[in-house]
Every structure is written in C-alpha cells, then in structure tokens.
Amino acid sequence: MFILNNRKWRKLKRDPSAFFRDSKFNFLRYFSAKKFAKNFKNSSHIHKTNISKAQSNISSTLKQNRKQDMLIPINFFNFEYIVKKLNNQNAIGVYILPSNLTLKPALCILESHKEDFLNKFLLTISSENLKLQYKFNGQIKNPKSVNEIWTDLFSIAHVDMKLSTDRTLSSSISQFWFRLEFCKEDKDFILFPTANRYSRKLWKHSIKNNQLFKEGIRNYSEISSLPYEEDHNFDIDLVFTWVNSEDKNWQELYKKYKPDFNSDATSTSRFLSRDELKFALRSWEMNGSFIRKIFIVSNCAPPAWLDLNNPKIQWVYHEEIMPQSALPTFSSHAIETSLHHIPGISNYFIYSNXDFLLTKPLNKDNFFYSNGIAKLRLEAWGNVNGECTEGEPDYLNGARNANTLLEKEFKKFTTKLHTHSPQSMRTDILFEMEKKYPEEFNRTLHNKFRSLDDIAVTGYLYHHYALLSGRALQSSDKTELVQQNHDFKKKLNNVVTLTKERNFDKLPLSVCINDGADSHLNEEWNVQVIKFLETLFPLPSSFEK
C-alpha cells in the first residue's frame, strides 16, 4: 500500500494535479481532484483532528504490511472486509447480516455520529482505493466529489451503496452492495429507518450492559447473549466422495474387478478427474465458509496439491467407513450407504460431489432450518416409476428400489429425484434407515459396481424418507445441471456472466459439471469445462499447498 505522509498531504493540498499525476496511489481517483483538495482544506465538515487520527491509523496499518508503493491485493472483498476496515478507524455503529446472503447487509449509524462516520468512511474507501456508487432518487449515482457525497447522504435516512475494487484477481469477488442507514435517537430508544430481522425500535435499557452503538461496528445480534431463533446453533460438515482414474493402484483394482460388459456404471468418464475437487473447494471457501470440517472419502491417494495439514480437511479412506468384505468398491451407491460412519462427522452435513460448485454466497440457512429440518432440492418433475429393468439407467433402478421401500413404509408413492446439487443430510436419519432396512443396505454395500438390486440411499431414499417423516422440506433454490448433450457452452457462459454481474437473483445455488457417457472423449466439452472452472475460481484456496 501507499502511505500518505505529511509531505504528501501537503502536496495534495498545494497542487492536486501534480499529486494525481505523480502518485501511484491515485488517491480518490473516482472523485474530482480539485474539488476534493478544496473541500479537504476548507470544509467545516471534515475536521482536521479526525483526518489526522484516521491518517495515523491508516499509516500504522500500512507500515505493518511493509508496503510503501503499491496496494496489496484483496483475496475476499466483501461486506466483512469494509466492516473490519471501519473498525480499524474506530467507527461506531451496528451491522445486520441477512439470513439470506444474497440479500444486502446493513450498516447502521446514529444520526448524531453521521459526521464522524462519514469522515472515517470516506477516508477508508480512499485509502483502500475503492469505487463508490449509490442509489439516489431512483438512479445509480457515480459521485464526482466529496461535497456531492456529503450533500446527498445528509439529506436521506438510508441508501443502498455499492463498493468495488480492481485489487482482486477475480471479478466475481470485486464488488458488493450494502445498505447504509442513519438511526434517530430518542431518550428511551433508537429507531432504525427500515424494518430488520431483529427489531426496528431498540430500547436503550435493553443494551445498557453491552457495547452496541458505544464501541466499534458490532453485530446487532449482540442485543442478546443467546443465539437468535433464526440462527443455527449446530455445526455443519461437508462430505465429498472423490476418485482419480489416473491413480495407478486404482487402475489395477479397476481392471481386476471390472465386469465384461460395458455400461455407464463402468464408463471411465464416471471416474475422470480434471481437478474438479480443487475448484469445488475454492467455491466452498469463497461461498460457503460456514462449514466446520470437510471430509473427503476416497480409495485413491490424495491429490498432490491438497494440503492435508489444513485442520479443516480430513481424508477418509473407504476402509475407515466400510467393512473389508465390501472392498474394493467402484459403486457410488455402495459408498453412500456408509457416509454416516465417518468418524467425527457432525449430525448435520452436506453431501457433495467434486463436480458440484457453489456460485454465490450461502449460509447454513440454505441447507437447514434453524430447528434442524433439512432443505431438499427435488426436481420440479417426476420420472421415477415402474419396475427395475436391465439396461435402464442404474440411478433410476436404484430410485425404483428405494421407492418400493417408501411405499411400504408410508403408503404413498414418490417420483422426484434430487437435483444434481449439494444435499442436506442428517446422520441420525441415515442410521435409522440402516437399522430399518439392513438387508437392502448390506446388499448395496457389497456391490462392486452399480447394480440392478441397489437402493439409492443418498440419491433418493434419504430425501423422501426425511420428507415423509417430517424432518425435511422442499426448497425453492434453483440449481443448474450441465452435460455434454446440452448447449453446454451457452449454459456455462451464462453462469459466468451472472457471476460477474453479481446477479444473485438469477444465479443458481450451484452448478453441476456432469461427466458421463464417455464425455471425456469430447474435446470441446473438456476445453469449455476447464475454461469455466478457471474463470469462475482462479484464486487458490487455503486448502492448497
């Protein structure tokens, strides 16, 4: 970063044009230089003491970073980033995070603190070289001067703001919106200008024993020492199943046990790895940071890039969750009968494949209600009916067998598969089903490849069992499936475009890059998939060496 020492401040006031011409810092490059310098020097609103203190804080931070002439790249530019920077400036207020992270968070300031806050806010976005836009009189405004910002913000009680930066390596994390609110203060209460999830009217006696509106930018949920009723007070883990068809030991076992006939269940494209796991982990770190621990279930060696020293990662070999009599296995149906046996796994977990990628910020509420009820994303249409038939898709036959069990148990018929997306699972329900259907679980567990008599435990049985027993509900979240027989280039480009625009309303919760039917032989498919992955998730995660 670039430090504005006393000499540079004097140069800015004395000759703004020369300062902007010579400075790599490009201070407030989106504002008018002359107007800023004039306001900086003469405005009664911007107090020298505040600016001196803010400059001192910025300089101290910058010296710690030991960066004299360049801006440090930002890995994750989001609302939490600006809150942290404002706390470094000793700004005072509260913030409100929405239950749905695709909605705007709010930053709430007392009217009596408005002047001090705006000084610190403008210094923050200036020192961070951020671009500011906001909605004013029904239009998105690009302010040209500090005076313009000051005049606009002193005339309104709340405003939607957008901050953006060119200091990230990925355009998907280069901007965000939030709402800035100014609260009126009465002798007995504080009144927020808009309704929020906690309380629009905050009685002062309810915060007499905490630091809300007294110190720092704090979470409004600190109104109580207890969790809010909509918040989740349980951990959620993440489980991947992963295979690498280039693993030498895996290849030897596969050749030994592969049946003579060919089907989609034995196609090598089902086991192809193009480092999707790496990109899936990047997507979860970027968009699903609420996860406690990540378990990766496999019968292959870990990829060379994976950092197993990361405390959040645990590699789980098949023999840790499956009996020796069932090994080796090449059937996802078999592996999925045993996920609840992972040592140390939380009761609540999300089951995902390496080809499922998150496309927007998510939290626990996207997968479970706060009372523990799971959220399902069943397909909008049904296609499970009839009897198991040789030669028909193995996933369909597995669902048909599961359907037979469900009809006997609940006296209802089901038809909908789960979408190709991360699945909300509970170990207590899986243990319950295993105890109730031991023969079907054991038979599926011991099939080396997907077979006609399998049950699809995580693909079908679990979701409808949980739904019919009152422990799951359908979710309206959109997901996207991309296969080689689709217009895959158009689909992938659409996700990239929506991501760059941060169009969360239209973005799916996740996208699945679904291999199969020898898709690994399709060169255009392979090229477009790699391009998509590297465009959407270019930044290494903390899980990589």
UniProtKB/Swiss-Prot annotation:
<dbReference type="InterPro" id="IPR021520">
    <property type="entry name" value="Stealth_CR2"/>
</dbReference>
<comment type="function">
    <text>May be the polymerase that links individual UDP-N-acetyl-D-mannosamine monomers. In serotype A the capsule is composed of repeated units of (alpha 1-6)-linked N-acetyl-D-mannosamine-1-phosphate.</text>
</comment>
<keyword id="KW-0808">Transferase</keyword>
<dbReference type="Pfam" id="PF17102">
    <property type="entry name" value="Stealth_CR3"/>
</dbReference>
<dbReference type="InterPro" id="IPR031357">
    <property type="entry name" value="Stealth_CR3"/>
</dbReference>
<dbReference type="GO" id="GO:0016772">
    <property type="term" value="F:transferase activity, transferring phosphorus-containing groups"/>
</dbReference>
<dbReference type="Pfam" id="PF17101">
    <property type="entry name" value="Stealth_CR1"/>
</dbReference>
<comment type="similarity">
    <text>Belongs to the stealth family.</text>
</comment>
<protein>
    <recommendedName>
        <fullName>Capsular polysaccharide phosphotransferase SacB</fullName>
        <ecNumber>2.7.-.-</ecNumber>
    </recommendedName>
</protein>
<dbReference type="Pfam" id="PF17103">
    <property type="entry name" value="Stealth_CR4"/>
</dbReference>
<dbReference type="InterPro" id="IPR047141">
    <property type="entry name" value="Stealth"/>
</dbReference>
<dbReference type="Pfam" id="PF11380">
    <property type="entry name" value="Stealth_CR2"/>
</dbReference>
<dbReference type="InterPro" id="IPR031358">
    <property type="entry name" value="Stealth_CR1"/>
</dbReference>
<keyword id="KW-0270">Exopolysaccharide synthesis</keyword>
<dbReference type="GO" id="GO:0000271">
    <property type="term" value="P:polysaccharide biosynthetic process"/>
</dbReference>
<dbReference type="InterPro" id="IPR031356">
    <property type="entry name" value="Stealth_CR4"/>
</dbReference>
